[in-house]
Amino acid sequence: MRIRVERHVQFSNCAIKKKNDLSGSLKLDNLPDTLTEFTAHQNKFSGSVDLTQLPAAMLTLILEHNRLSGSVVLTQLPDSLCKLYLSNNQFSGALDLRRLPSSMFYLFLNNNSFSGTVDLSQLPQGIKGLDLSDNELSGEVFIPDDLFDSVGADNTKIIKRHME
């Protein structure tokens, strides 16, 4: 099944309801400029996704529980993006978390195949939740006390340390 979102459609959010078993690729590069929320979780979408062309108005993107794969560029997300959920897919490659939008407060990347050393030294100040669990990630990371328990790193080689 193919779902096509035309540019002339004016709406602020789009939800592809869960457990529809929708499949195929998910093209996000031509979404309406005014789209603020896009949800496509618990389906069977596959292939890579380009997050570098999301609408400037995008606040929330939920792509959890699919079969999406490939590397993910997180350094060119819209400045407005607050919530990004990519959990339970097959994404891989290194993660660059040094230039996330300053508005970001939830980032869930758990249960994928991301690998390499992570640097959490430049997380947005308002971040409230970050889950990196169940990936092939490593590194020693220093986390402020108020965020320490909100950073998930279970089943990784990440060593969490309290920032002094």
Task: For each feature predicted by the language model, list its residue ranges.
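LRR N-terminal entry segment and analogous cap-like coil->beta motifs
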Residues: M1-A40
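Acidic (E/D-rich), amphipathic helical modules within compact regulatory domains
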Residues: L26, A40-K44, V49, L59-R67, ...
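Structured C-terminal portions of repeat-based eukaryotic scaffold domains
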Residues: K83, A94-S133
